[in-house]
């Protein structure tokens, strides 16, 4: 190769010495292996486009997809949103959904196919280790939500097109692979920690390697806590405790401040804006100031009203009832016969988005990480580098800061309790049972169960809009206590659910899997260890106290 380059240089010298070089010298003599400015810009655009499409699969930027996955599923089962469209007779909240309500995570072309096809495209044009790390992290973020919805899922056998009619992986194996991919991403980021990619390529962290590394470690801590009640051992022989401690002890560590929050910029949205905002506003009656298809759930408002939580004005619009409930925060009960939206439903508090259509899509926040550390220390005795009280109060402070509200010092010493639910529309849907006996103020002498409940309640409030994460915590810990669906609304078509307090533990697989992928579907149900319905618990849902 060296001889060829020397000969090429000599030939060029001879040609130029014999006469003037051609005026098109720069074009004719361009190195065919060198990328010019136009090609580089095209490559950068292709990478940015692929990453943006992948980012849009974590919390989907497609409004219809996001409505099913994060409003009608996560939003309701997490106790944040209530279904308000009285045209819906079959809902997840009533445990009688149709297949097109529950198959979205696996069958929508806006989730797995969009993730894998764009991941394959980016891998084909970039060898940048930062980009490769981002691909791995985003893949874990997406498929974590999928496996936590169904249990065993296709993972290792999915190809570049995202086709899911392949063999399923058992859920422990899915988690093992997710931890491995996070570790691979962290290793790549470690080697390039002072580098960045073009900020316009990255609509989450502006191309900053350090922030992606903190996010990866934070995800690792989140997943370690998810499997805490299992006997899980990673491919490297690590227990959940060791995985969590490893994430926190890493040189870059986990999220520490709101500057570390993982959220997708509104620059990534299409004309419809924030998909959750648009989905909540669908079918708003004329003149409504509270929204349409989704309204605020009674569950979270009962807690926040009782705690006199100043974040309410950021989370909800005020109810439009008259009399004693005028201009107060009043949520709608989930799992009921939905009242007419145009006359009654529009009177309940709506779901608020601080910047409307331009509100960023939250993936994970520093407050959640602080609460993860508080639970790890207080309940399970992990070494997180501080006390449970310190991390608990840090989580509350971070959330108040994130939402831009004052009064955190007074809030942290509060002893008031969540209020019971009185429905202004009539007593039949009211709920008089006390949801919790705990105030906000920390108690060092509390039992581990009480510590866990207090931590999860505040984590739940801080994670508003992240309904799928709230639902996962509810299944894992039993907290917060939520208002159950009404027996009269659920009827007999309850997807195997007999205990309304426990609620839905998973979603059924897409109905077509039984015919389009029968052998692999049968094996998936066998790995699940129970019937393919909403009552069967998945592998990590094994806390003996939740029964």
Where are these regions (language model features)?
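Membrane-proximal, proline-rich intrinsically disordered regions
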Residues: 21-79, 125, 492-547
């Amino acid at each position: 190769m060296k001889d060829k380059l020397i000969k090429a240089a000599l030939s060029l010298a001879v040609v130029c010495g014999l006469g003037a070089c051609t005026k098109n010298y720069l074009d004719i003599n361009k190195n065919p292996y060198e990328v010019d400015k136009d090609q580089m810009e095209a490559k950068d655009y292709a990478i940015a486009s692929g990453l943006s499409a992948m980012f849009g699969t974590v919390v989907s930027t497609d409004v219809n997809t996001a409505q099913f996955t994060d409003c009608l599923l996560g939003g309701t089962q997490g106790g944040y949103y209530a279904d308000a469209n009285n045209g819906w007779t079959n809902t997840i909240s009533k445990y009688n959904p149709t297949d097109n309500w529950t198959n979205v995570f696996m069958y929508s072309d806006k989730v797995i196919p969009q993730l894998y096809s764009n991941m394959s495209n980016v891998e084909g044009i970039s060898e940048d280790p930062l980009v490769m790390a981002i691909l791995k992290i985003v893949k874990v973020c997406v498929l974590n939500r999928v496996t936590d919805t169904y249990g065993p899922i296709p993972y290792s056998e999915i190809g570049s097109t995202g086709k899911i009619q392949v063999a399923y992986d058992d859920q422990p194996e899915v988690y093992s692979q997710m931890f491995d991919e996070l570790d691979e991403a962290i290793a790549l980021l470690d080697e390039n920690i002072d580098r960045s990619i073009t900020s316009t390529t990255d609509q989450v962290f502006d191309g900053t390697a350090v922030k992606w590394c903190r996010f990866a470690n934070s995800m690792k801590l989140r997943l370690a806590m998810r499997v805490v009640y299992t006997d899980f051992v990673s491919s490297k022989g690590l227990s959940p405790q060791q995985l969590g401690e490893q994430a926190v002890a890493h040189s870059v560590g986990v999220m520490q401040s709101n500057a570390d929050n993982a959220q997708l910029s509104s620059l990534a949205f299409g004309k419809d804006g924030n998909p959750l905002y648009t989905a909540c506003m669908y079918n708003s009656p004329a003149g409504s100031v509270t929204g349409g298809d989704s309204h605020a759930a009674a569950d979270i408002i009962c807690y926040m009203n009782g705690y006199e939580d100043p974040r309410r004005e950021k989370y909800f619009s005020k109810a439009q009832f008259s009399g004693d409930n005028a201009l107060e925060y009043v949520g709608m009960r989930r799992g009921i016969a939905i009242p007419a939206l145009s006359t009654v439903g529009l009177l309940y508090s709506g779901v608020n988005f601080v910047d409307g259509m331009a509100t960023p899509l939250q993936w994970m926040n520093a407050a959640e990480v602080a609460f993860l550390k508080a639970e790890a220390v207080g309940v399970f005795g992990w070494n997180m580098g501080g006390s449970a009280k310190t991390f608990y109060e840090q989580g509350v402070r971070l959330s108040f800061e994130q939402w831009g509200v004052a009064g955190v010092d007074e809030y942290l010493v509060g002893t008031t309790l969540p209020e019971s639910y009185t429905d202004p529309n009539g007593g039949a849907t009211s709920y008089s049972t006390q949801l919790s006996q705990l105030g906000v103020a920390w108690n060092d002498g509390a039992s581990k169960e009480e510590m866990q409940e207090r931590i999860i309640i505040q984590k739940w409030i801080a994670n508003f809009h992240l309904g799928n994460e709230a639902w996962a915590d509810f299944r894992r810990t039993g907290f917060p206590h939520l208002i159950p669906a009404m027996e009269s609304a659920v009827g007999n078509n309850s997807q195997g659910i007999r205990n309304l307090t426990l609620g839905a533990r998973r979603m059924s697989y897409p109905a077509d899997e039984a015919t389009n992928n029968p052998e692999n579907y049968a094996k998936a149900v066998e790995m699940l260890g129970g019937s393919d319905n909403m009552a069967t618990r998945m592998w990590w849902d094994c806390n003996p106290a939740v029964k």
